[in-house]
């Protein structure tokens, strides 16, 4: 099945001292395949969901795509609550996988989460809860972190810093937990949009870097983060294009 191919993504050399984990090769196209599969697997094992379950989640897109894909694979009904300003490609993919898309105002992740919670309360839907479940952190601690260490040992390189764009905070905190035990000197760096610098102490705002900067720090424990970097939407686009060319 498709979800059997989640994880074990390539370690790509970008420069002499910089490597990237290529999460885009996951079946759903993003790192969000990992926590979605992990949460579904754990929920099935605990008997919290079955073939008659309807699963709902608030998302900026990637988690929704992963959930819609795996929902189609496993036979679940999927409902996705998403701000209306997310890309049309994401909306199309969700619908192609058979998910029902419910849109809220642009950039309104608080509203998306509130509506998701209301559907859980009123309809009895099962919430994935990517923004709050410790399973999100556990997933990256048990899988992504171990893969990073394994890759570094294979190429004979020591890791001095880990940098991640931050949405729910699951990736960042899972990797941080791993390095706190394995090599505490590794620097943990979070990246967020300049237009919505919530972790930096600023106000949330609209931005164009879909997938990070969802308006709150959510799972992020700032005491465990060594540095926070902000980047503008325009600069992020320029750098992404440069990376693709090189």
Regions found by a protein language model. Give the residues of each.
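PLP-dependent amino-acid enzyme catalytic core
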Residues: 1-246
